[in-house]
From Swiss-Prot:
The species this protein was found in: Chromobacterium violaceum (strain ATCC 12472 / DSM 30191 / JCM 1249 / CCUG 213 / NBRC 12614 / NCIMB 9131 / NCTC 9757 / MK)
Disulfide bonds: none
Keyword Magnesium assigned: no
Coiled coil: none
Sorted UniProt keywords: ATP-binding, DNA damage, DNA repair, DNA-binding, Nucleotide-binding
InterPro entries: DNA_mismatch_repair_MutS, DNA_mismatch_repair_MutS-lik_N, DNA_mismatch_repair_MutS/MSH, DNA_mismatch_repair_MutS_C, DNA_mismatch_repair_MutS_clamp, DNA_mismatch_repair_MutS_core, DNA_mismatch_repair_MutS_N, DNA_mismatch_repair_MutS_sf
Compositional bias segments (type: Basic residues): 8-26
Protein name: DNA mismatch repair protein MutS
PROSITE patterns for this protein: DNA_MISMATCH_REPAIR_2
Record's function text: This protein is involved in the repair of mismatches in DNA. It is possible that it carries out the mismatch recognition step. This protein has a weak ATPase activity.
BP GO terms, sorted: mismatch repair
Positions contributing to ATP binding: 635-642
GO molecular function, one term: mismatched DNA binding
GO cellular component terms listed in the entry, alphabetical order: cytosol
Amino acid sequence: MAAIPTPRLHRGVTHLSRQTKSRARHPMSTPQHTPMMQQYLALKREHADKLLFYRMGDFYELFYEDAEKASRLLDITLTARGASAGNPIKMAGIPYHAAEGYLARLVKMGESVAIAEQIGDPALAKGPVERKVVRIVTPGTLTDAALLDDKRDNLVLAVNMVKGVLGLAWLSLASGEFKIMQASVEDLASELERLKPAELVIPDDTGLAAFEGISTPKKKLPPWQFDIESSKLALTRHFGTRDLAGFGADTLPVAVGAAGALLEYVKSTQGVNPAHISALSVEDAGELIRMDAATRRNLELTETIRGEASPTLASLLDTCATSMGSRLLGHWLHHPMRNHGKLARRHGAVRALLSRYQDVHAELDQVSDIERITSRVALRSARPRDLSALRDSLTALSGVKALAASLDSELLNELAGVLPTESPVQKMLAAAILPEPATFLRDGGVINDGFSPVLDELRAIQTDCGDFLLKLEAREKERTGITTLKVEFNRVHGFYIEVSKAQSDKVPDDYRRRQTLKNAERYITPELKEFEDKALTAQDRALALEKQLYEALLDQLAPHIAELKLIAQAVAALDVLSAFAQRAAIGNYAEPQFVPEPKLDIVAGRHPVVEAEVERFIANDTRLSAERKLLLITGPNMGGKSTYMRQNALITLLAHVGSFVPADSAVIGPIDRIFTRIGASDDLAGGRSTFMVEMTETANILNNASEHSLVLMDEVGRGTSTFDGLALAWAIARALIEKNRAYTLFATHYFELTTLAGEYPAVANVHLSAVEHKDRIVFLHHVEDGPASQSYGLAVAQLAGVPAKVIRDARRHLAELENQSAARVQPDLFSAPAPASEPELSPAMDRLQEIDPDVLSPRQALEILYELKKLAD
């Protein structure tokens, strides 16, 4: 993006000295101010938490503290002009035609902006021109194409927490998708990672501890706006329903509270009713494979661990022709499904597209972002080129429809059925909008020729002006005999007939003098005056009529919003399925098979992203079942353990979003969750060490993994002392085998853990092979049965460039340690007696665990206290 130039300043503006800056504080008692500043301050009071863009002619001006802040954030000049209430008025301005670029920068910084436009006619105003805030731009409520990321949904999320229950409501204003769910408060972090909202809406009495370390901009609302009954009323009024049962939301009161607050907040920012928000849907976590925040980060689904957009799974798969497809792809990757029937339909569609994806892409290349254009139509913010793009996109869909309908896939045929053959919207727009309309309605040149006879006549006056003047000049020369006569126009005096002074005595009686010059006279005739009146008003009248016709067209499009949203969804799904087919064809992916029994059987699996980045990738098998639940993986650092574990998680995830998978074959049983404990770093904002982060993630796995979960554990226990880490790793592995019984890939450098395979039939040792030759190590990246023979730590250090002297010292010290270890008998950590069972709890402790202090009245609490004392005695 080109740099936005600093706007030209008004003449007579002086820079503020430091001394002046320190004095420029404005009192809010408006009688001391000029009428215009009174108007500004009244608007500012209503939007005190936002920057106020105040329209003055061709500029948006910011005043006082807003001017200081904008100057700092946008690097525009801070100035002062005049005074109000005895203080210099700090101000900074930006040209209105460049406002979108500045808004984009402010929104990326998390700022919200209220835009006040002139709505009165300056010619009729006796005081300041009437102004009002017509739009509020916040990070989560963007709809303008210039402010949005084409490939990512822009969500605003409302959070409501009541007695340990988490209610979430989120909305993409750019698409109209409105969803809710309820969960446990402990799920907040994972949901924020999944949804990645651009803005949070929370009650202002919510404790900030819950949002510690979360940099997402937050809008705080009064708690009463989250009231359940008020929210139900707001939602049913908006949707025109008696209750929320039809949406499945009647049993989710905390989420309904969030949804009501969110809807009212969004309405307050738009200035119009968001009619495209036509339904509320409940997200059922039970239908999805759940992943916590750490898992989504570690698998690098849509951004790398470093926060970059590539290389990720999404960047690899995203060959979508439309922005709608790219956004839906990201959504699918974060929402893997458990329903094998629905997945089989997606896999069938991918199979049918394997030889036709190029044709689908060619057709979809002509389709614009129907989804976001539809939302702008509903919000009445659609620009002329939005409508021409919508018209052209609907025209192009006939080819896509025919292609999808011809393929052997139930899902593709259903999607084809949604696409129109002849769209009434397309016909309406073809008649109303010019083939290449102007960018902005204010410039005219938007409404098609022939759509309005009155508009055609007004345009003809402007177009025929030159011809009329030439004909009039020729006729007047012939009538008067004045060969030097000229008919001309200027902005000051309008149209006139100019005659030299030497021939001014020849002018007819109907000539009326308009201006006298040194060597000429200028005249006007009744005919020329009549034409002048028509010509000078024709442009203004044409612009006013175009605006009127455009607004009427938006009204006519409103009933078709729901239909257009369905079309957009169908196009996006076709686009994603075609991208899946392209990756499957290029990467030689296999169609996965689902079975009801516990199984994860992958033959020649590959890591999809790493495979695309290297010349040659070593494929590996994975076999897990009810009898073989945990693979204990050993081998050298850089040997490929982490890549091997991640590839199995990604293959599993790809199968559950409807894609083919990078393997020769994959047979997968029921999966409910995917967990990863891979890598860690200090959580400085949360005040947690690397080891604390590691243990928190491990605790989450041990407390929530089931026999249908896939668990990846990499080097657990390495962040503490050797014996502490070894003991923890052993106990964690044991718990995963005995209690959770999850499918587990457990990578470790603690070779002592390999003895677990002798204790538990469900444990199998595997290792990543490597060979050492002349103090050099070669990683083979191949998974083989059995434990690794050694760690190759010194060889890896040498490969990393550690100085040779350090390597020699390490070898010498390693030999000494190995000799000492062989000379003394070391206690066998794993032959120690089984841990004693936990002591039975006392009756008082049993009773204490049953109590929920949040629901007790003071009297009940006192009674229970006496009861506990009696039990303790």
